[in-house]
């Protein structure tokens, strides 16, 4: 059996995953990256995206919100705002959030004081799209 790395994903609610895995692929703010056992120490910010990990032939995916990642001593720890496993994603809710965000973005001529709302709508759309992608196993 190949050497593994310990993966831990922590949200404000607590640790949701703590297991040994073969490989982790993460949505880093500077680009996606992969981590295997014995990886060099690393700190990275994490963007909204799909976090995947493999154990043997089994591949698992989580939707994660922004946060941080540390790789050290054969352990990779994610401190993220939220994390949802494929089976926990409510696709109806995600689709409604997608439609709502698209409607907000489609509004033209927003006053400058509403620019922040537009940015929030874009972030909401991105989260909804990632949730749908993870739920569909893409």
UniProtKB/Swiss-Prot annotation:
Q: Which GO terms describe its cellular component?
A: plasma membrane; proton-transporting ATP synthase complex
Q: Where in the cell is it found?
A: Cell inner membrane
Q: Which InterPro entries match?
A: ATP_F1_dsu/esu_C_sf (IPR036794), ATP_synth_F1_dsu/esu (IPR001469), ATP_synth_F1_dsu/esu_N (IPR020546), ATP_synth_F1_esu_C (IPR020547), ATPsynth_dsu/esu_N (IPR036771)
Gene3D superfamilies reported in the protein's UniProt record: ATP synthase delta/epsilon subunit, C-terminal domain, F0F1 ATP synthase delta/epsilon subunit, N-terminal
Name the principal localization, coarsely classed. membrane
A molecular-function term among this protein's GO annotations: proton-transporting ATP synthase activity, rotational mechanism
Pfam families the record matches: ATP-synt_DE, ATP-synt_DE_N
Query: How does this chain sit within the bilayer?
Result: Peripheral membrane protein
- What are the protein's UniProt keywords? ATP synthesis, Cell inner membrane, Cell membrane, CF(1), Hydrogen ion transport, Ion transport, Membrane, Transport
Please indicate which superkingdom the organism of origin belongs to: Bacteria
Q: Does the keyword Transport apply?
A: yes
Q: Cross-referenced HAMAP family, in alphabetical order? A: ATP_synth_epsil_bac
As for what it does, the entry says:
Produces ATP from ADP in the presence of a proton gradient across the membrane.
Which family would the database say this protein is a member of?
Answer: Belongs to the ATPase epsilon chain family.
Can you state the subunit structure given in the record?
A: F-type ATPases have 2 components, CF(1) - the catalytic core - and CF(0) - the membrane proton channel. CF(1) has five subunits: alpha(3), beta(3), gamma(1), delta(1), epsilon(1). CF(0) has three main subunits: a, b and c.
Q: What is the protein name for this chain?
A: ATP synthase epsilon chain
């Amino acid at each position: 059996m190949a050497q593994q790395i310990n993966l831990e994903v922590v949200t404000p609610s607590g640790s949701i995953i703590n297991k040994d895995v073969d490989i982790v692929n993460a949505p880093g703010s500077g680009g996606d990256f992969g981590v295997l056992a014995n990886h060099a120490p690393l700190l990275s910010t994490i963007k909204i995206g799909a976090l995947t990990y493999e154990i043997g032939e089994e591949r698992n995916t989580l939707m994660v919100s922004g946060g941080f990642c540390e790789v050290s001593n054969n352990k990779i720890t994610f401190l993220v705002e939220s994390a949802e496993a494929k089976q926990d994603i409510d696709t109806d809710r995600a689709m409604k959030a997608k439609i709502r965000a698209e409607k907000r973005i489609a509004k033209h001529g927003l006053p400058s004081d509403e620019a922040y709302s537009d940015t929030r709508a874009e972030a909401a759309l991105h989260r909804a799209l990632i949730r749908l992608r993870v739920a569909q196993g893409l």
